[in-house]
Amino acid sequence: MKQLEELLSTSFDIQFNDLTLLETAFTHTSYANEHRLLNVSHNERLEFLGDAVLQLIISEYLFAKYPKKTEGDMSKLRSMIVREESLAGFSRFCSFDAYIKLGKGEEKSGGRRRDTILGDLFEAFLGALLLDKGIDAVRRFLKQVMIPQVEKGNFERVKDYKTCLQEFLQAKGDVVIDYQVISEKGPAHAKQFEVSIVVNGAVLSKGLGKSKKLAEQDAAKNALAQLSEV
């Protein structure tokens, strides 16, 4: 953890008072499960808190920054900023992926590169920072890490995968696209949805996410990847 402390101090001017919070934020459930006898805490509860404060701060920013945008436009832009893929990218940008504690199985299966894990890690860090330093510290961190990318318009230029898939398929003729929830697992604060895309009665692809919307986006992303290979 010493190297992580140095990274946060030198790169972001953040010094945690409660290092237990920081360590918990960087501990995945797979690691905690493999060390149950040591009563190791994992980051899911901090992730829940971080998700909430991230939504609030980004909503505040968009409301102030874009006085002429509609509620729908702001919601769509916010969803692109806080989606799993974006948060995983910010984790990598901050080099957080090098410090997360994973179980042996998760490590071997490539968990350190997985967007789901890295996106959750970013949210968990925000939750820990909120508890340790307060919401203004979270705002400063996001202003340093996330807001510059929003200012550049990077997220406004990105179409959501569902829209891209719909345009791709409709260009080839009349199609009926249906998103169906296959399963819903996990506790209320850490749901995992699986969704399938059914096109003209046939399953095209499946996707996973922490909400139905995220699972639908993942399924659409997978469908576009499959179609590009055809």
Swiss-Prot record:
Active site residues according to the UniProt entry: D51, E123
Sequence ranges assigned to domain DRBM in this UniProt record: 160-229
Catalytic reaction equation(s): Endonucleolytic cleavage to 5'-phosphomonoester
UniProt xrefs under Gene3D superfamilies: 3.30.160.20, Ribonuclease III domain
An example Gene Ontology molecular-function term: metal ion binding
This protein's GO CC annotations: cytoplasm
UniProt cross-references to PROSITE patterns, sorted A to Z: DS_RBD, RNASE_3_1, RNASE_3_2
GO BP annotations listed: mRNA processing; regulation of gene expression; rRNA processing; tRNA processing
Major place of residence: cytoplasm
Entry-linked Pfam families: dsrm, Ribonucleas_3_3
Alphabetized InterPro entries for the sequence: dsRBD_dom (IPR014720), RNase_III (IPR011907), RNase_III_dom (IPR000999), RNase_III_sf (IPR036389)
Family: Belongs to the ribonuclease III family.
Function: Digests double-stranded RNA. Involved in the processing of primary rRNA transcript to yield the immediate precursors to the large and small rRNAs (23S and 16S). Processes some mRNAs, and tRNAs when they are encoded in the rRNA operon. Processes pre-crRNA and tracrRNA of type II CRISPR loci if present in the organism.
Protein name, as recorded: Ribonuclease 3
Organism in which the protein naturally occurs: Streptococcus pyogenes serotype M2 (strain MGAS10270)
Recorded name of the encoding gene: rnc
